[in-house]
Amino acid sequence: MEAALAACALPSLRILNTKPRFRCSFSNPSLPISPNSLITRKSSRFTTAVSSPPSSSAATSTNSPPEPEALFEPGSDKFDWYANWYPVMPICDLDKKVPHGKKVMGIDLVVWWDRNEKQWKVMDDTCPHRLAPLSDGRIDQWGRLQCVYHGWCFNGSGDCKLIPQAPPDGPPVHTFKQACVAVYPSTVQHEIIWFWPNSDPKYKNIIETNKPPYIPELEDPSFTKLMGNRDIPYGYDVLVENLMDPAHVPYAHYGLMRFPKPKGKYIICISNSCFNPFTNLQILLAEKIDREGGKPLEINVKKLDNKGFFSKQEWGYSNFIAPCVYRSSTDPLPEQEHEYPAPAASDKAALSKRRLSLIFICIPVSPGRSRLIWTFPRNFGVFIDKIVPRWVFHIGQNTILDSDLHLLHVEERKILERGPENWQKACFIPTKSDANVVTFRRWFNKYSEARVDWRGKFDPFLLPPTPPREQLFDRYWSHVENCSSCKKAHKYLNALEVILQIASVAMIGVMAVLKQTTMSNVARIAVLVAAVLSFAASKWLSHFIYKTFHYHDYNHAVV
């Protein structure tokens, strides 16, 4: 999925056939190949590789799938889900004038801007009075968070500052501990709000000793980094493994990137035009075996521990920083550079000029629910993001998410039927293209017993019922309402639709009111044509709004 999502944010490439020579460019900016097109390095102190399919002789002797090989770091310990920072939302999609309700790790949160302290606050989304959600409240004229059920007001420290029903000459009940709201440690890093899921006062200054994952390119001013977010109707583990899987891209997302259809053997060659960052990669020779163009992929995974793992691929490097961050980049993280041989001088020069990363932040919400924040920072073609509004990129990126959404929603239920801890036994994994996915599942099984620790809030073996397809693929409540750019575009385009409808009716009305002697035949025809065009434009715009911001199905059988 990562290659496909990035396709809507990256410039074009060219794919050349050996016989005959031809060129073909994509209609949408796209990656040349999946960012996880991988190569295997032989020397490694830690390796995870999925074994190749058995030979014919071996296949006749056994029907069991080959077991992946792995070497694990000694002294591993269990992953503590409540001793880590979790992202909540990009600040570009939060309105400072209103409180926002979000759920992370099964915890109901209210996120709001405290203008008195000039910072974002993350608090328990529960009023201590009658347990009403504070996210349905407002920020009053004094900058306090007000519960609109009975008017109780709270400051950024969670202290109750006003109980309107308490007599002024009575005891100061608003100062009682029971009147306070739990406040979670929070910080803004990489223009994203993060919170620590423990409101115990001893964690108040946890940021001094434990910080959220640091991603260098998100702090580099030479990189562009437009963000997007969407609520996903399947769970955290399925979301993460899908983003790590390069082999599904040409199939599950077929038709979203228009690849050429060469016959026989062809060369995938990376052009240095159109701001392409991959000029240092070798030319690949592959044989086309089907319409979609799938091919063998390899990967080399290093250092699996409870903090995650990292890997080397053909186009660059990948990191899973547990529990939320998956990063693919042309460069390794600084602390991992010693794990790989230094690139050649020419390669290093190319990388220093054009650098690209794909950042996916996967947030556990509740069983069967997750949230994805994505950004594709790059230091080339920066002007494109300054010209094109963010919502335009989100059109294609949401279509990518929709195209395999139903597959993953159903897959999650089948995994649960067989038991998440039995994933490797239930799935037949004979090729190396699944190495990243296998490694993530091993991390999930080994360090977390194949489940998110919900601390008893949910039954981990129960998932929400599958809704009707139009509700499952809903874009408005899962994305538009949570994206400031798409929400604004939706509002303005709806207004434009109404204007076009009014204009078409008004022009017909003008023709009816004015006498024939007042308006020439040419003018009458012109007004009539304008009215028809205006009405047609309003109907087209209505369809565009619905398909872009509400519901866009994806039928693989007819693509």
Curated annotation (Swiss-Prot):
PROSITE patterns, per the entry: RIESKE
Reaction it catalyzes: protochlorophyllide a + 4 reduced [2Fe-2S]-[ferredoxin] + 2 O2 + 5 H(+) = protochlorophyllide b + 4 oxidized [2Fe-2S]-[ferredoxin] + 3 H2O
GO biological process annotation, one example: protein transport
Cell compartment(s), UniProt: Plastid, Chloroplast inner membrane
Alphabetical UniProt keywords: 2Fe-2S, Chloroplast, Iron, Iron-sulfur, Membrane, Metal-binding, Oxidoreductase, Plastid, Plastid inner membrane, Protein transport, Transit peptide, Transmembrane, Transmembrane helix, Transport
Note accompanying the cofactor annotation: Binds 1 [2Fe-2S] cluster per subunit.
Function of the protein: Part of a translocon most abundantly expressed in etiolated plants and involved in the protochlorophyllide-dependent import of the precursor NADPH:protochlorophyllide oxidoreductase A (pPORA).
Residue ranges with Low complexity bias: 47-64
Pfam families, alphabetized: PaO (PF08417), Rieske (PF00355)
UniProt entry tagged with the keyword Cell inner membrane: no
Organism: Arabidopsis thaliana (Mouse-ear cress)
Protein name: Protochlorophyllide-dependent translocon component 52, chloroplastic
Transmembrane segments: 493-513, 525-545
Residues noted as binding [2Fe-2S] cluster in the record, renumbered to the chain: 127, 129, 147, 150
Lineage of the species this protein comes from: Eukaryota, Viridiplantae, Streptophyta, Embryophyta, Tracheophyta
Lineage top rank: taxon: Eukaryota
Gene Ontology MF term list: 2 iron, 2 sulfur cluster binding; chlorophyllide a oxygenase activity; metal ion binding
Disruption phenotype: No visible phenotype.
Membrane topology field: Multi-pass membrane protein
Record EC number: 1.14.15.-
Residue span of region Disordered: 44-70
Entry-linked Gene3D superfamilies: Naphthalene 1,2-dioxygenase Alpha Subunit, Chain A, domain 1, Rieske [2Fe-2S] iron-sulphur domain
Known regulation of activity: Down-regulated by light.
